[in-house]
Amino acid sequence: MDAGGAGPFGAIGHVGDGGSARDGSGWDPPPGSSAGPCSDVTHHIYLVSPSQELFSFHPAGLELHRIGRLRCGDGGPFSMAVDRNGVAWIVDWNGPVSRVDIATGRCETTPYKVEDGAPFRNFGMAFAADDGPDQETLYVRDAVFFNDTDGANPARTLGVFDRRSYAVRPLGQGAGANADLTGTGDGRLFGFVKQSGASFVSEFDKLTGATLSERALPGVTIGSSWAFATWGGAFWFFVTNDEDALSSRVYRLDPDSQAPPELVMPVLLTAVIGAGVSTCAPTEVPH
């Protein structure tokens, strides 16, 4: 995410000229890729920088591995999610959504189109598990910029990104300003919210978009970009260091503890604007 209302509008985005809709949930990485349904590479956190560099981050050892530079989109990444097949979905600042093989960095642009100024041109995004086995849904939460109407009680709309029709179906609004999203293998959806100089982690209702809970994050100051993911039963927050825009701070939060977020890496050697983790990621730290 970069620091850069509810209504009865219909689905947003469509299949554009020059491309036909396929079952997006079945888009597979290319032959020779090590990605695949819940393969080993889907068990990490993936990061994308403002300069389109793709990385894998291994929380157990605090290791960062560069995969390569992406060649999709022309406005720079805005947010990212990763599915169970090892495909990253990245929304661009200019609105397009691309799919990326997380093992190789190969990418292609989807037909998703939204006009400038329309809802869901930019959004936080994440997959969360469904009730059925091996099923998941891509959730997106609208991001609003240069909006003087937020006041003291901002709200944003949650939607579902349909990977067959390349359209967003709005669900409803929840309290809180712009947020990056992360989902869990047990079906919950959370947001890392920046609001009025403070930061929060919130849980959202996947049916209505309502904010179910909110927890302040003392000591976590969001600058020009931020992202987060869940791994090993904890939340991992990535916040760009504004005094050095080429690096980030990494915080870890145990949701079952009342302790504040722990700064685990003062300097991660990349700025981070998007983070994604699949619903295959471990819910406990592997031994």
Which residue ranges define each predicted feature?
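Ser/Thr-rich, Pro/Gly/Ala-heavy low-complexity intrinsically disordered linkers and tails
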Residues: 1-38, 286-287
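Repeated scaffold domains used in trafficking and secretory/extracellular systems
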Residues: 35-37, 74-85, 116-130, 173-186, ...
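An edge-strand/N-cap motif at the start of beta-rich repeat modules
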Residues: 35-66
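Conserved beta-propeller blade signature
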Residues: 44-48, 86-91, 133-141, 188-192, ...
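Structural motif
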Residues: 51-56, 95-101, 146-160, 197-203, ...
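Short loop/turn segments that connect beta-strands within beta-propeller blades
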Residues: 59-62, 101-105, 161-166, 205-209, ...
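A short beta-strand motif characteristic of beta-propeller blades
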Residues: 63-72, 106-116, 165-173, 210-219, ...
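Blade-level signature of beta-propeller repeat domains, shared across WD40, Kelch, NHL, RCC1
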Residues: 247-287
